[in-house]
């Protein structure tokens, strides 16, 4: 079992979370097996979570698992630099007590390894076991029978919110991956990370926390418990240093009274934009108004109009 007091003390001893930057050590890892961390970009969520995973690897031999929605998102050009900040800050040497000084991504294995390299960047030694393994939701069926890891106690689901892809069928295969990794252990932690703050994302409805999430304000953190007792820690991250820098950028480029820019400016949910048709008694006729559709836990009333210009409208 992971001793989180010990983990936090080790992180502080190593000095890998400098003051003025967001770090995840305040998150409720003891009580909640699922964490959802939401923010704008450049807060340092992924780097912070990877650093904690590295400390868990050092203390307990934990293998980090990094999950994206599709195999295409695991291209070397996308994921090879995940540890770049950690490497450049010299944290690899700190966490490994000088044994290694860099991290290498092996493309054909989809694994990251600690390595020791000389001043010219030539590899001298590679760790025998990988630090992190990459997985994709669209490959979930293959993991069921072909993969197991008894130390998969740090599971990262990166960029879980996307406005570009249809993901509503991802929930079951994603949880299949969790089940494959966790097996019968209760020591694992699942961390969802998002740079797009979309209040209507399907995952909130699948976990039946959509109403609670909608009440979150910038800087809030809360614990939600399901009727069956599963606890989720969710945080809408507010980083003071990032917010200060954002103010200047927003004033120069995004200072418009337009809700569509809310998520770009930071501190608010992204707003979905839908076209609306103006209807008047002169250009349309109401045909039905007692049609109801149940979706995402809500009952929506739909009215059908006959328009003179474009026909039937719902």
Identify the function of each model-found stretch:
Residues 2-314:
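Phosphate/NTP-binding elements of NTP-utilizing enzymes
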């Amino acid at each position: 079992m992971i001793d989180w007091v010990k983990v936090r003390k080790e992180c502080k001893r190593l000095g890998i979370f400098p003051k003025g930057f967001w770090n995840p050590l305040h998150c409720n890892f003891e009580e909640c097996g699922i964490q959802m961390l939401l923010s704008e970009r450049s807060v340092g969520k992924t780097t912070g979570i990877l650093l904690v995973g590295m400390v868990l690897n050092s203390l307990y031999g934990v293998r980090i698992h990094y999950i994206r929605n599709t195999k295409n998102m695991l291209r070397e050009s996308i994921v090879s630099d995940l540890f770049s900040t950690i490497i450049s800050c010299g944290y690899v040497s700190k966490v490994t007590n000088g044994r290694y000084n860099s991290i290498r991504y092996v493309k054909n294995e989809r694994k990251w390894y600690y390595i020791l390299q000389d001043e010219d960047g030539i590899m001298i030694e590679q760790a025998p076991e990988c630090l992190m393994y990459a997985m994709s939701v669209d490959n979930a069926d293959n993991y069921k029978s072909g993969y197991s890891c008894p130390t998969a106690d740090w599971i990262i689901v990166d960029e879980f919110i996307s406005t570009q892809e249809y993901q509503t069928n991802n929930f079951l295969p994603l949880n299949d991956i969790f089940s494959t990794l966790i097996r019968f252990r209760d020591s694992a932690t699942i961390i969802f990370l998002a740079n797009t703050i979309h209040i209507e994302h399907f995952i909130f409805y699948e976990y039946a926390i959509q109403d609670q999430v909608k009440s979150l304000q910038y800087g809030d953190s809360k614990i939600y418990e399901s009727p069956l007792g599963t606890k989720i820690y969710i945080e809408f991250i507010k980083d003071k240093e990032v917010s200060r820098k954002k103010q200047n950028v927003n004033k120069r480029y995004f200072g418009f009274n337009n809700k569509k820019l809310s998520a770009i400016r930071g501190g608010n949910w992204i707003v979905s934009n839908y076209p609306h048709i103006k209807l008047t008694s002169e250009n349309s006729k109401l045909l039905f108004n007692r049609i109801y559709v149940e979706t995402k836990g809500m009952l929506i009333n739909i009215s059908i109009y006959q328009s003179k210009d474009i026909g039937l409208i719902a």
